[in-house]
């Protein structure tokens, strides 16, 4: 890449930072936005070329944001400094999409409402997480909690952990959600069995299970809509 074009050789109005300042961030493509985060390229490679290489290696922006420290630093020319910039960007994205509702009530009226709340965070996880969303009698979210990490099965997912927290929060209803790191949200037999077990326990406790949402990479499935609840 000895003859690679340097950023200073690109017409000023076409450089990522200048384009953003002149025309707005929404006019930049993913490579240009990532270039602004990374700031500089590597030896023999300008920052736009580096950004394009990363996007190509990880098959798009979602792959870059899902990459681990080891994944990123395995790329030639990428040290811990640049890797930390990418990891920080990914974490900010997750936190932005995570439920942070100190100043407003969030009411869950449909599976789409819940998916919009948690999909951005959970679709990027590489490990299965079982999250419980606690609601009051008006379906307003009063809290969330990750109650289990790892592959779900009925022998290790205990309803008592879920309902203990629900009682502590005076929750009238709950929704459970977990992700499939494979990207396919199709429910397994274990997913269905866990759902039915929690539903039965909820009926005994007087705390209604409204739904079980399974999050995949590009979508979600509601077990209520599938007729299991």
Swiss-Prot record:
Q: Which GO terms describe its molecular function?
A: metal ion binding; metallopeptidase activity
| Positions occupied by motif JAMM motif | 178-191
Q: Quick one: a GO biological-process term for this protein?
A: proteolysis
Q: Which UniProt keywords apply?
A: Hydrolase, Metal-binding, Metalloprotease, Protease, Zinc
Checking InterPro entries in the record gives:
MPN, RadC_JAB, RuvA_2-like, UPF0758, UPF0758_CS, UPF0758_N
Location of the MPN domain: 107-229
Similarity comment: Belongs to the UPF0758 family.
Q: Write the protein's name.
A: UPF0758 protein CLL_A0562
């Amino acid at each position: 890449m000895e003859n690679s074009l340097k950023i200073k050789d690109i017409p000023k109005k076409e450089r990522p930072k200048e384009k953003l300042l002149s025309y707005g961030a929404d006019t930049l493509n993913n490579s240009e936005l990532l270039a602004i985060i990374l700031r500089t390229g590597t030896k023999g490679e300008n920052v736009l070329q580096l950004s394009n290489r990363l996007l190509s290696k990880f098959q798009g922006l979602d792959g870059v944001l899902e990459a681990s420290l080891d994944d990123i630093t395995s790329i030639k020319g990428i040290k811990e400094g640049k890797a930390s910039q990418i990891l920080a960007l990914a974490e900010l994205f997750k936190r932005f999409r995570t439920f942070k509702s100190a100043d407003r009530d969030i009411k869950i009226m449909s599976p789409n409402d819940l998916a919009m709340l948690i999909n951005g965070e959970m679709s990027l996880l590489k490990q299965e997480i079982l999250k419980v969303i606690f609601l009051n009698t008006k379906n307003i979210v009063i809290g969330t909690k990750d109650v289990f990490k790892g592959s779900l099965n009925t022998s290790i997912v205990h309803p008592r952990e879920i309902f203990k927290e629900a009682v502590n929060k005076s929750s009238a209803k709950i929704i459970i959600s977990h992700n499939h790191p494979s990207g396919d949200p199709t429910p397994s037999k274990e997913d269905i069995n866990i759902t039915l077990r929690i539903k039965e326990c909820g009926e005994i406790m007087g705390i209604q299970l409204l739904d079980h949402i399974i999050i995949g990479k590009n979508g979600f499935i509601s077990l209520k809509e599938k007729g299991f609840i």
